[in-house]
């Protein structure tokens, strides 16, 4: 493959692990000697054959060496380097220093082989695909080019990313984790592998065209590739089937490495990649068998029956010496047997055609062995005794495989409903189940069956076959054996295919083998003997290795069956030992399900092994590599190709052209079949070997981990695995049963998701829910850098409860592999239906694993402010002299359904975040402080308040001083705060001037006509609190000035003062105009007058900012500056900010008087940058300054208590410690929100994030001060805030990229609304924007009658270290103030 690297490889010749390990040496000359040679070296490390395989083109794995090879190749373009002998140079010396451990060498080989593979992919994309697309060199159409290269570009992109991750992994465990995290992304290979036969056919056609053949040859010479394009196109097929082998090799040597902790991850990676390979092989197998079936139909002469496809899948085919229906004597003639799910067809070869000689329906099939001929057996028709055929197999393996499959299919197709035990007895006695002698193997696997009875049923027809085998059943527990056998068979008839897979049931298959000493030979010995814990015959194929794994469960004979089983990954449940069984499983799937119930344990055992075996066998052309198991070797081929049966038969099956070619290609072992690929033969054998040796050892060990993985997937894939109802037992059971599994799974999950250990533990049900949500698109897949894991009691309970103890780890592993295979199958089907492209898998993959089943969408605000750990969207509650403050604050929440306890308000600096509810206006844009709909202000310490935009429920500031009245709101009284009630009908006639007065403990809210903010005296003690608040008053018809700015102007500009200076914005006359974002400069903000259509009304919103602790005068004291709408003012820190009243034909001039009080010099930045609210473009204050946002809303909407009023969706200034506050303008329309607080970056969310980050610094000190200020009500409020904090921290976690525009954020309403017990009517709640996963609303807040808020359970896990740190502090503070559970009163 080095050539793939082409010149590239030259750049990094030495890097290739293969070389480095094997001997960096691998002298250039040597490597060059054979371009392929280098590849081989890389591959060689784990398995020598693998390396040689690489040489054969098929051995994409050979690529690994490419790194070094390319250099050689560049220097020496030899077209066909010598044999892959060089591959085994690995012993040559190690590049540097001490000889690395085996584990390290294997890890390096994985990286190096991946590097070489990526170079080859790049060569395909850039050197072949590019010219063909750009120049139309060969005159190929776009469709032809697509057929030729399929989705090779997606694979190249994905592999490049995988390589980058692998190179950044410093340990073997990290490498395994890369595969676990990206396991789902590998499904893109399915499309490629399925298209490969078509690609190969087209390439062969082109090779017959002189111009095309000439161009390809010239191109190969120019690139100095030793292998033709055909070999390169085969590499992805080879590579995907080798990952699990490489990982198995990694697992084999894990003992040398660190402890067992990382082992679980390695095992999960093995299971995941085995499932991928298994699924791909199964799909290929089905495709090949379908092609083979058509070919047989075409060649068959004398057949007058229906199309052969009516008899199910082609399970096995083979050539035997045999006789006709006459007597027991063998006539020496050759008979071709084609075993379908429902019928055995006997034919004779006549040249290239087949002559029909008879058929026997599987329900009437009788099989008996000849005591005189160890290789002979007889098949007859129970209904027509004369219809019998004496056959002689070529070896014991083949005989065992056929007898097992025939018996299994007989029971699966039997019309009678045979009890499982009866079936087992029949199989053992009537059918002379040789497996009888091999029951011991089965006993090992019993647990497997029990864990996943349903799955077994659906997936284990093959398994059942296992059950039929007497031997295995005995070992399992006599009764289970028979039961599983019965059920599987009974069910099998219904689902022939499942049956086949299950037919792979090792138990049955092997038992027959076991009966005859011969069958016990190769595979039986390995499987049975090793069966108990680890069958690790190095000579075995992947399938055998899987069988070994299964052996742990006690399934030994399954080896052959397994091969068959692999044919149907879909039947993953059927880890049938042989492919034949796998195919058979289709008819018997149903019965297998029934049987599964009876014999869960048994089936599980059988099932687990078969699928793995099959998968591995398929992947590694087992035939060549399975010295120990001749039959198995053939079997692997069988699974891969319809020809596989022939293989079993021996030469004939493998010879079947169409299938064999395809299977060979896919299987590597068959590669030789491809003439154009020079090294194909060696390659094929190599892969097989690698698979065998690798799979056996590693797979067995990781069996548990794989099972765990499978559970995870099942959880992830509700559709398939998630359905564990069928496999439910198995999945949950596995978790419970295998402590190791649970451990593995949690660890896997954790690693997979990159969550902390605490997050690591996830029950299957949780995973299932998360996956379902992702699959359904409820949660955005693209994700969260660090998804938050929220475990729910129900999830945990379900998980543990569902689990059923008793299944051995190997069983669970097998089940997992099967489930994973199903998962991949479903996903592929979905992909194919929707699109044939899975390029976007990577991004969504992680999310899916990480995705929490979180009902609540991420809060836009929270997302926006992931960075601000301190400011979690909670207003710090500062009880100045007003005890009412806290209570009031909660009140708005109460009315506001939107309030999610997650209303994030910046707390630090004691400054609350002013929020504009954008319930109506914002379609879910995040509001820093108040949820739009919730119309909730979270009181913050420092007494600063958020303005409540929601009409129905303004949140009073915690500072007693601020009151926001929304006409829609009834009245929310804070302790010590006057309640202002605005008639629901009144369109907020009142100015709602909200003046924050630092006056001690005095606070009054003007009545409707006027809303005054009372400033709680700002004392140095409250550095955070900035007394001033903005309240947004809601105007009926016309949007009021947002903040102090223009009234009615859709665009309000929040002003923050830096250094205590504030810019006043004059509202522009244009009311329809959306709020324009204002840019703020340094300490001063340039006031922008929002254009108001209406002339500025008399209403003025004076902003008074007082730096330091100086209290503001009483309302009267407030400086009100009425400035023409157009006049922009910049104020010094010390200067009060006047807002230009926006004159507006509002029914009432609504004036928001904001007094900015820099609560304390403490606030880190009194001169915090003003936050500008713009349509969403305005940057929010970066500084921790208290920003209060006031949003005006239309009264009508607000009055309904629907928090959806004209709040500027974006309008949400985040208060920062600086004490400056932002005013947000609200949209003229209650629903419409034109103003968005955005960071300088632009979006409100960003602003919030920024504020939070700003707050982060100062927040710690403010909490203490605020704590001091808290009064009794404050404590309750603080409890509420604590809950809110948790939810917001979660949201923050969700949205680390707080910069996202608010609009894009999930709507507040989405999560909170559903939770509010009594959501106010929302006239026009904006549709929530696309949901994003959010952990923000983990805390549920219920609004009870009387405006009481009581947080529901909040089960959250914060995984961000930063979150944990800052969050813990703030949490501690809140908790000190009061329990979050305390009810809140409006």
UniProtKB/Swiss-Prot annotation:
CDD domains: PH_PLEKHG1_G2_G3, RhoGEF. The modification Phosphoserine is found at residues 90, 450, 469, 911, 1049, 1261, 1310. This is Pleckstrin homology domain-containing family G member 2. Coiled coil: none annotated. Residues 592-603 have a biased composition (Acidic residues). GO terms for molecular function: guanyl-nucleotide exchange factor activity; small GTPase binding. It is linked to Leukodystrophy and acquired microcephaly with or without dystonia: An autosomal recessive neurologic disorder characterized by profound intellectual disability, dystonia, postnatal microcephaly, and white matter abnormalities consistent with leukodystrophy. Residues 8-17, 45-62, 1301-1317 have a biased composition (Low complexity).
């Amino acid at each position: 493959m080095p050539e793939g690297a082409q010149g590239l490889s030259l750049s990094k010749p030495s890097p290739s692990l293969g070389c480095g390990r094997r001997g960096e040496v691998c002298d250039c000359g040597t490597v060059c000697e054979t371009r392929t040679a280098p590849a081989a070296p890389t591959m060689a490390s784990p398995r020598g054959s693998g390396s040689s395989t690489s040489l054969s083109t098929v051995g994409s794995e050979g690529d690994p060496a490419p790194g070094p090879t390319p250099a050689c190749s560049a220097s020496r373009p030899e077209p066909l380097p010598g044999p892959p002998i060089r591959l085994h140079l690995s012993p040559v010396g190690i590049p540097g220093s001490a000889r690395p451990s085996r584990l390290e060498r294997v890890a390096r080989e994985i990286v190096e082989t991946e590097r070489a593979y990526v170079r080859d992919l790049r060569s395909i994309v850039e050197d072949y695909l590019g010219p063909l697309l750009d120049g139309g060199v060969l005159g190929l159409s776009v469709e032809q080019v697509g057929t030729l290269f399929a989705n090779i570009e997606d694979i190249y992109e994905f592999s490049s990313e995988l390589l980058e991750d692998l190179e950044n992994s410093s340990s073997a465990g990290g490498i395994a984790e890369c595969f676990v995290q990206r396991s789902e992304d590998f499904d893109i290979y399915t499309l490629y592998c399925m298209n490969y036969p078509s690609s190969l056919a087209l390439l062969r056609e082109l090779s017959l065209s002189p111009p095309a053949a000439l161009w390809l040859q010239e191109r190969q010479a120019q690139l100095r590739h030793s292998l033709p394009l055909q070999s390169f196109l085969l590499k992805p097929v080879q590579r995907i089937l080798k990952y699990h082998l490489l990982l198995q090799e990694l697992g084999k040597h894990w003992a040398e490495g660190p402890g067992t902790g990382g082992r679980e991850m390695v095992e999960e990676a093995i299971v995941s990649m085995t499932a991928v390979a298994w699924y791909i092989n199964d799909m290929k197998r089905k495709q090949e068998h379908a092609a083979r079936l058509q070919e047989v139909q075409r060649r068959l002469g004398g057949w007058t029956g229906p199309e052969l496809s009516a008899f199910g899948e082609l399970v096995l085919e083979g050539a035997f010496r045999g006789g006709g229906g006459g007597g027991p004597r063998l006539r020496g003639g050759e008979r071709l047997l084609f075993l379908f799910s429902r019928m055995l067809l006997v034919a004779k070869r006549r040249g290239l055609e087949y002559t029909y000689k008879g058929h026997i329906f599987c329900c009437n099939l009788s099989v008996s062995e000849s005591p005189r001929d160890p290789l002979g057996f007889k098949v007859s028709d129970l209904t027509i005794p004369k219809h019998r055929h004496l056959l002689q197999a070529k070896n014991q393996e083949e005989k065992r495989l056929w007898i097992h499959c025939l018996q299994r299919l007989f029971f699966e197709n039997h019309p009678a409903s045979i009890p499982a035990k009866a079936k087992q007895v029949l199989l053992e006695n009537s059918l002379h189940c040789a497996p009888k002698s091999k029951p011991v193997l089965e006993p090992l696997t019993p647990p497997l069956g029990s864990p996943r009875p349903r799955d077994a049923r659906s997936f284990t027809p093959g398994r059942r076959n296992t059950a039929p085998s007497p031997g295995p059943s005995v070992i399992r527990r006599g009764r289970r054996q028979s039961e599983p056998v019965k059920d599987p068979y009974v069910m099998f008839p219904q689902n022939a295919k499942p049956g086949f897979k299950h037919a792979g049931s090792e138990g049955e298959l092997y038992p027959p083998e076991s009966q005859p000493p011969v069958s016990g030979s190769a595979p039986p010995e390995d499987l049975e003997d090793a069966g108990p814990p680890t069958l690790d015959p190095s000579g075995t194929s992947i399938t055998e290795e899987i069988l070994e794994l299964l052996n742990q469960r006690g399934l030994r004979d399954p080896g052959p069956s397994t091969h068959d089983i692999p044919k149907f990954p879909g039947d993953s449940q059927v880890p049938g030992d042989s492919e034949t069984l796998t195919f058979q499983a289709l008819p018997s799937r149903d019965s297998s399900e029934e049987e599964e119930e009876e014999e869960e344990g048994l089936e599980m055992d059988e099932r687990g092994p078969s699928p793995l075996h099959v998968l591995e066998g398929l992947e590694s052309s087992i035939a060549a590599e399975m010295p120990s198991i001749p039959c198995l070797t053939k079997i692997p081929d069988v699974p891969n190709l319809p020809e596989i049966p022939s293989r079993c038969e021996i030469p004939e099956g493998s010879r079947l052209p169409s299938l064999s070619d395809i299977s060979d290609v896919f299987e590597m072992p068959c590669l030789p079949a491809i003439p154009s690929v020079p090294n194909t033969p060696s390659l094929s054998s190599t892969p097989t070997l690698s698979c065998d040796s690798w799979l056996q050892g590693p797979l067995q060990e990781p069996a548990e981990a794989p099972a765990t993985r499978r559970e995870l997937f099942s959880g992830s894939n509700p559709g398939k695995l998630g359905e564990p109802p069928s496999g439910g037992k198995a999945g949950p059971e596995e978790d419970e049963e295998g402590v190791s599994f649970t451990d593995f799974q949690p660890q896997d999950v954790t690693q997979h998701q990159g969550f902390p250990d605490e997050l690591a533990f996830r029950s299957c049900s949780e995973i299932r829910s998360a996956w379902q949500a992702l699959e359904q698109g409820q949660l955005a897949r693209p994700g969260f850098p660090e998804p938050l894991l929220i475990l729910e009691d129900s999830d945990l309970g379900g998980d543990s409860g569902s689990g059923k103890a008793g299944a051995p780890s190997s069983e669970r592993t097998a089940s997992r592999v099967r489930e994973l295979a199903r998962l991949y199958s479903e996903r592929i089907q979905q992909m194919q239906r929707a699109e044939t492209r899975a390029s976007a898998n990577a991004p969504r993959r992680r999310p899916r694993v990480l995705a929490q089943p979180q009902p609540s969408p991420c809060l836009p605000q929270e997302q926006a402010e992931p960075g601000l750990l301190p400011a979690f969207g909670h207003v710090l509650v500062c009880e100045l002299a007003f005890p009412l403050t806290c209570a009031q604050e909660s009140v708005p929440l109460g009315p506001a359904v939107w309030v999610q306890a997650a209303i994030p308000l910046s707390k630090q600096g004691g400054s609350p975040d002013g929020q504009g509810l954008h319930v109506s206006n914002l379609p879910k844009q995040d509001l820093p402080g108040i949820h739009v709909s919730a119309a909730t202000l979270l009181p913050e310490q420092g007494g600063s308040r958020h303005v409540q935009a929601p009409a129905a429920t303004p949140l009073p500031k915690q500072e007693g001083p601020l009151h926001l009245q929304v006409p829609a709101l009834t009245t929310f009284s804070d302790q010590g705060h006057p309640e202002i009630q605005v008639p629901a009908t009144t369109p907020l006639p009142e100015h709602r001037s909200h003046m924050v007065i630092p006056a001690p403990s005095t606070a009054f809210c003007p009545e409707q006509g006027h809303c005054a903010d009372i400033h709680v005296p700002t004392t140095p003690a409250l550095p955070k609190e900035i007394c001033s608040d903005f309240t947004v008053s809601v105007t009926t018809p016309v949007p009021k000035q947002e903040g102090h700015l223009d009234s009615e102007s859709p665009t309000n500009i929040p002003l923050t003062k830096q250094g205590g200076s504030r810019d006043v914005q004059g509202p522009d006359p244009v009311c329809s105009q959306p709020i324009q974002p204002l840019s703020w400069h340094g300490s001063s903000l340039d006031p922008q007058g929002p254009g108001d259509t209406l002339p500025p009304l008399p209403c003025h919103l004076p902003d008074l900012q007082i730096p330091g602790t100086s209290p503001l005068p009483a309302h009267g004291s407030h400086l009100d500056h009425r400035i023409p709408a157009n006049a922009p003012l910049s104020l010094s820190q010390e200067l009060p900010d006047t807002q230009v009243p926006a004159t507006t034909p509002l029914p009432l001039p609504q004036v928001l008087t904001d007094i900015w009080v820099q609560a304390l010099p403490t606030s880190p930045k009194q001169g915090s940058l003003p936050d500008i609210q713009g349509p969403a473009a305005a940057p929010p204050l970066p500084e921790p300054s208290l920003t209060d946002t006031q949003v005006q809303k239309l009264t009508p909407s607000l009055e309904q208590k629907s928090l959806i009023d004209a709040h500027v969706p974006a309008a949400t200034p985040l208060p920062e410690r600086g004490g400056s506050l932002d005013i947000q303008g609200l949209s003229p329309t209650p629903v419409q929100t034109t103003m968005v607080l955005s960071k300088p970056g632009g979006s409100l969310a960003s602003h919030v994030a920024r504020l939070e980050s700003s707050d982060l610094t100062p927040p710690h000190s403010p909490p203490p001060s605020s704590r001091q200020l808290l009064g009794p009500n404050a404590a309750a409020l603080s409890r509420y805030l604590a809950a809110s904090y948790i939810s917001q921290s979660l949201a923050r976690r969700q949205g680390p990229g707080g910069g996202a525009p608010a609009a894009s954020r999930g709507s507040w309403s989405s999560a909170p609304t559903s939770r509010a017990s009594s959501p106010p009517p929302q006239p026009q709640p904006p549709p929530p924007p696309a949901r994003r996963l959010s952990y923000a609303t983990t805390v549920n807040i219920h609004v009870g009658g009387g405006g009481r808020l009581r947080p529901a359970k909040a089960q959250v896990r914060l995984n961000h270290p930063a979150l944990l740190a800052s969050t813990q502090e703030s949490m501690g503070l809140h908790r000190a103030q009061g329990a979050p559970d305390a009810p809140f009163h409006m």
